[in-house]
Amino acid sequence: MAKKVLVVVDMQNDFITGSLGTPEAQAIVPKVVEKIQGFGGTVLYTQDSAADVIAFTFDTHRCDYLETQEGRNLPVEHCLKGTWGWQLEPRVEAVRTSTPIEKPTFGSKGLAEVLKARHTYEGPLEEIQLVGLCTDICVISNALLLKAFLPEVKLTVDASCCAGVTPESHQRALEAMKACQIEVVNGEQT
């Protein structure tokens, strides 16, 4: 039986109301919660192979963040492991159904490897949907990684459940993903 996966990218406090938060990020939280609730998935690593899956990623940095390549280019401490900013937004946490995948970089090779293994050993994935933050950094990075790891699986990004650093960069990222054969749904027409 074909399966669908919902990947919830970095719906963490620091990206919503914390050090890198935006009004656009705050606005999508109820939509993301609604999407998760309507998806009906179970825990990523232990669910029945015929069930739909919801996977969560966590942007995760250590105390030496400002010394990293990313930190030198974005010198704003955020998502330091164990802090309030690293935690999922409370409404998203309340509907979380799986163990988050920590990622110290924009894209998660670990997420791609887990989904490729599921696709290979448990039967083909029908579709991978992505939602979350930030469209123009981590959502696009994970979408492109997944496209490279699973080129024959349909990838969809729900634009109404994503927000970028700015509305303009959000829109540019959606256009870039469309150009890479990633379907964008619920987006404004450009």
Where would I find each of the regions flagged by the language model?
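Amphipathic, non-transmembrane alpha-helical secondary structure
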Residues: 30-33, 37, 116, 140, ...
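Active-site beta-loop-alpha junctions enriched in small/polar residues
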Residues: 48, 106, 160-162
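Active-site acidic carboxylates
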Residues: 1-100, 152-156, 165-186
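Phosphate/ribose-phosphate-bearing ligand recognition and processing surfaces
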Residues: 128-141, 147-150, 156-167
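Short strand-loop junctions, especially beta-strand C-caps/beta-turns
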Residues: 18-20, 104, 133, 160
